[in-house]
Amino acid sequence: MATIMRVNNLTSKTELKKGMKLLIPNTRGPRANIPLFPTTRWTHIVIHHTATDQGSAYSIDGLHHQRGWENGMGYDFLIDNGTRGKTVGQIEVGPRWIKQMDGAHTKQGDWNKKAIGIAVVGNYSETGLPDKMFDSLIFLVVTLKGFYHIPDKNIVGHRDVPGSATECPGKFFPWNEFKRRIRMF
């Protein structure tokens, strides 16, 4: 009970109310299998949005090839929004991750060499992130940060990469809740 109270910022059992949504730590349903590779190169995580209404790893890969990116999809992971035959919150692993290649998700300095790029399908400058996608993002980030020992301060939005001139992953991305949730693990 103490752990549940701590992760939900409750100081007393009397604060619990009927119908209240609580985070229950250390519970897991079926989850995506995230391939993890022994390396020390990954020191940061950069969160993006695709700024598109729909997408999948296959369609984003094609779009990035059209832009002249020889190795296709610039992100390491993509979280789907339920379009293009995918389910809401489905985590797709990109070929760059499988091959442990540099990303192509930010133009700044050495960030593509040291940062894992995760994109959520959608435009979060126009709307909020659906809960299932948010939960998948939290699961993925917590998995990666734990395995690669990435400190919370090194988990940023694309807009927070020094020298970036973008709103990505969007003004409606729930940063405060995101930071709160990843700190719990």
PLM features per residue range, with description:
Residues M5, H48, A119:
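Residue-level detector of conserved, well-ordered beta-strand and adjacent loop positions
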Residues M1-N33:
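Extracellular LysM carbohydrate-binding repeats and other cell-envelope/extracellular binding modules
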Residues P35-T43, D80-V93, T106-A115, V120-F185:
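Basic/polar, cationic surfaces and motifs that engage anionic cell-wall
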Residues P35-K99:
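Short, conserved "active-site rim" segments that organize catalytic pockets and cofactor/ligand binding
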Residues N9, K21, T27-G29, T50-T52, ...:
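Solvent-exposed coil/turn segments that connect beta secondary-structure elements
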Residues P30-I34, R96-K107:
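Alpha-helical scaffolding within the catalytic cores
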